[in-house]
């Protein structure tokens, strides 16, 4: 991704792409963080061969409580024959499905995807137009830097890579100071957020290179009042982490679901996302 999940845009991206191309490779671009660069920078301008746009966040659509996601994939001309089939084409005055694609990689799961999300995004994009999409990016960056400034006023939030400075549409913070002082982890604090009527945030992708991470992405849609409430929530949670650590350790207090055994959930020997996988791993125990 570029900007990276730290919220920092890497200005050397064209040089990276050039080196890969010189070695005979192809470059793919995960546009998960395009919310802050719509109408400002394009994957094509950096020389990428393939990219995808997540419809959640960037195009103002729900992620569905961490899934299912939905995306639009874009490729350069030389990769077009390999796109999944069927492909929607326009011929003889009407739209049709083209299955005659001998070099295609075949179907990629359900062909239609999340239709309702795609229609919602299409209407949103068409209603905004090119100028409106650029405005979306500008507001997303503005919101994120306002939230960043407010959170850095709290004792407990740290900003690594590098310290200080602005970010684009998201920021990865560290709550390691709170952990060092109280033993309360970033995961403990994430669970406590639920008690304030807010969906818990994304901590970090793996590997975790920032200790006790917090990744916040306010986007363009949140008001100043929303973000101020969010900051006040963190201020109160951090205060409680020092004053009454057990309150945070046992969170969520009001959540419908209590804490789960994350070690069990993350163990490859037991984790099963489907019934078929569960049966395969448990065998005669089922």
Residue ranges of predicted features:
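Conserved PLP-enzyme active-site core in the AAT-like
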Residues: 1-96, 103, 183-184, 211-212
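Short acidic-aromatic active-site loops that bind/stabilize oxyanions
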Residues: 2-6, 110, 137
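Non-catalytic terminal extensions of PLP-dependent enzymes
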Residues: 41, 91-108, 118, 125-286
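Catalytic-loop motifs flanking and including active-site residues across diverse enzymes
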Residues: 67, 113-120
């Amino acid at each position: 991704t570029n900007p990276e999940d730290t919220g920092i845009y890497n200005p050397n991206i064209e040089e990276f792409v050039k080196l890969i191309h010189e070695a005979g490779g192809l470059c793919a671009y995960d546009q998960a963080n395009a919310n802050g660069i719509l109408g400002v920078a394009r994957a094509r301008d950096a020389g990428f061969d393939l990219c995808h746009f997540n419809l959640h966040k960037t195009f103002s659509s729900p992620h569905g409580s961490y899934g299912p996601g939905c995306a639009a994939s874009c490729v350069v001309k030389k990769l077009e024959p390999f796109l999944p089939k069927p492909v929607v084409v326009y011929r003889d005055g009407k739209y049709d499905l083209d299955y005659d694609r001998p070099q295609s990689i075949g179907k990629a799961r359900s062909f239609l995807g999340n239709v309702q999300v795609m229609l919602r995004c299409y209407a949103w994009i068409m209603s905004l137009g090119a100028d409106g999409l650029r405005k979306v990016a500008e507001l997303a960056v503005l919101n994120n830097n306002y939230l960043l400034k407010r959170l850095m006023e709290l004792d407990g939030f740290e900003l690594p890579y590098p310290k200080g400075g602005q970010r684009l549409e998201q920021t990865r913070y560290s709550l390691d100071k709170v952990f060092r002082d109280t033993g309360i982890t970033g995961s403990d604090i994430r669970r406590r957020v639920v008690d304030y009527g807010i969906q818990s945030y994304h901590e970090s992708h793996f590997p975790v290179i920032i200790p006790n991470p917090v990744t916040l992405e306010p986007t363009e849609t949140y008001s100043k009042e929303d973000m101020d409430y969010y900051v006040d929530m963190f201020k109160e949670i951090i205060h409680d982490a020092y004053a009454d650590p057990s309150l945070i350790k046992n969170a969520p207090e009001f959540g419908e679901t209590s804490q789960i055994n994350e070690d069990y959930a993350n163990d490859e020997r037991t984790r099963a996302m489907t019934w078929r996988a569960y049966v395969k791993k448990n065998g005669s125990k089922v």
